[in-house]
């Protein structure tokens, strides 16, 4: 799998890219106003524990505050997970988000690929279960 990252307007120019979590309409007025207010705090380092966000989400969703992991995007969290788990063998359906493979390679994890098929809508089929051997200790599944 070739490494690429979505949202690369510097290579491909302006485009609507659904592979990244970016609003093609741009930020809302509420977000722009919040960003302006945040500029007043730009001399201070952000709260690396995200205490206010953690507290509000836990309260709203009625779950324990320890249930959250925050990062600067999905890719950072994937790398954090892979570095923490230090998996030895992964099962990775392809085609898929390239960051899964890249993160696994950073820890020298052996990757066993499961090729999905176009004629099956790139869905995982029953034969996937045959690939689930005891030595596989991490799997990435996505839609």
Task: Annotate each PLM feature.
Residues 118-143:
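Active-site phosphate-binding strand-loop segment of PLP-dependent enzymes
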Residues 33, 37, 59, 79, ...:
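Short, well-ordered alpha-helices that flank and scaffold nucleotide-derived cofactor binding pockets
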């Amino acid at each position: 799998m070739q490494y690429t990252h979505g949202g690369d307007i510097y290579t491909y120019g302006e485009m609507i890219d659904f592979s990244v979590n970016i609003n093609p309409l741009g930020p809302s007025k509420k977000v722009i106003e919040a960003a302006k207010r945040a500029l007043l705090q730009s001399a201070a380092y952000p709260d690396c524990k995200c205490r206010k966000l953690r507290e509000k989400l836990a309260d709203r969703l009625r779950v324990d505050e320890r249930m959250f992991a925050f990062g600067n995007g999905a890719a950072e969290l994937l790398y954090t997970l892979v570095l923490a788990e230090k998996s030895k063998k992964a099962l990775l359906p392809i085609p898929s988000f390239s960051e899964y493979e890249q993160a696994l390679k950073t820890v020298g994890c052996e990757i066993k690929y499961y090729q999905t098929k176009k004629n099956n809508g790139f869905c995982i089929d029953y034969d996937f279960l045959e690939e689930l051997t005891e030595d596989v200790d991490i799997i990435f599944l996505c839609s």
